[in-house]
Amino acid sequence: MGDHFDDVWGSGSENESEGLTNDIKKLREIHNNRGYLDGVTDSKDMNLQNGFDEGFPTGSVLGYTVGELIGTMMSLNAVYVEDEQLKSDLESAQKELRVNEVLTKSMFNEQLDLDGEHPVLLKWKKIVEGYEEKYLK
């Protein structure tokens, strides 16, 4: 009668307990990997947000300045269409003041601050001021 109840009470073969152990090991591995991935993802999200929060003020000021420069040149170009130099400068400004040109790593220190004024923006501020002097004063 003891043989009849052996499998009910867990006194089965070695292979069954080995299979259970392998299943538990596999399940543990899956959970560990998932936990690791969750931790990495959460860390990336948190650091990405922190980087965005730190860099946004600088980026927004630069973006505003670029918009102001391009907008001024476009307005002047619309009124003074015969000025070929203005047209050429506008095309150059639109290339040089693209986001990927203005927001390059080399322009910023480790704290994401500019060391002084942005050289490309400074160049175009002077050019735009020249056109403002020529046409608006």
Swiss-Prot record:
Localisation: Cytoplasm; Nucleus
GO cellular component, one term: cytosolic [4Fe-4S] assembly targeting complex
Keywords, comma-separated and alphabetical: Cytoplasm, Nucleus
Region (deca-GX3 motif): 35-75
GO molecular function, one term: protein-macromolecule adaptor activity
Region (Disordered): 1-20
Cited Pfam families: Yae1_N (PF09811)
Keyword Membrane among record annotations: no
GO biological process, alphabetically ordered: protein maturation
Ranges in coiled-coil conformation: none
Keyword Translocase appears in the UniProt entry: no
InterPro entries hit by this protein: Essential_protein_Yae1_N, Yae1-like
Protein family per UniProt: Belongs to the YAE1 family.
Oligomeric and partner information: May form a complex with LTO1.
UniProt function note: The complex LTO1:YAE1 may function as a target specific adapter that probably recruits apo-RPLI1 to the cytosolic iron-sulfur protein assembly (CIA) complex machinery. May be required for biogenesis of the large ribosomal subunit and initiation of translation.
Name of this chain's protein: Protein YAE1
Species, as recorded: Vanderwaltozyma polyspora (strain ATCC 22028 / DSM 70294 / BCRC 21397 / CBS 2163 / NBRC 10782 / NRRL Y-8283 / UCD 57-17)
Lineage of producing organism: Eukaryota, Fungi, Dikarya, Ascomycota, Saccharomycotina
